[in-house]
Amino acid sequence: SMGSAVNAGPILLTSHCAFFLKLYSLTKDEIFRDMARLGALGRDAFVNEETGVASYYWNRFDHGAGLFPHHAWWQIGWIYDYLLAEAELRSNGKISFPRGFMTPKVGTHRTAGFASGIVDGKKASLILRKDLVSVDNPNVDYITAESEDGSVLFVVLLNNQAKENNLNMIVRSSQLASDKEMKDYTKQVKLNAFGYKIIKIKL
């Protein structure tokens, strides 16, 4: 994306990744799917150690985007949109959440989380809760959602590699909004190449 970088060089934010997956779902042209995944997996190429924020001006590389928090918000936005798009694509629509308009300035990613979606036929709302889930494999991402009636926590695991991956997952009961006394949920999971799994935990 050239954006408004001018002398700073191309902008390295790959906000178009989810859009490319949508194009792939419509055209079945694998170049869109492959470009989306290559762009997303390269997101950690130049990350500032102090702030944890990726650079997106070509001339800065791993110096980071700066101390302004809105730089991180943009990156959270496109990554989350991409993960939701991958989940929808891999599940053939069994995982689906409504999206808002495309955001201006940075790219083509869209907002989510303002309305319930569907996970495996059940209405659910996206949740982002610090320390709720941990996985011991950096090649696996996850999305969390809670059923509308509050009875089920969904953890959607996504393998980001073209090979099988194994992982150990922990869901910490202390981060669950449940009236029941629960133990931490642990599970060993095997994921196929670019595969996904829906883990359902009763609350």
Model-derived features: where do they sit?
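Surface-exposed beta-strand/loop patches in extracellular or lumenal glycoproteins
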Residues: 158-174
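Solvent-exposed beta-hairpin/edge-strand motifs
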Residues: 170-185
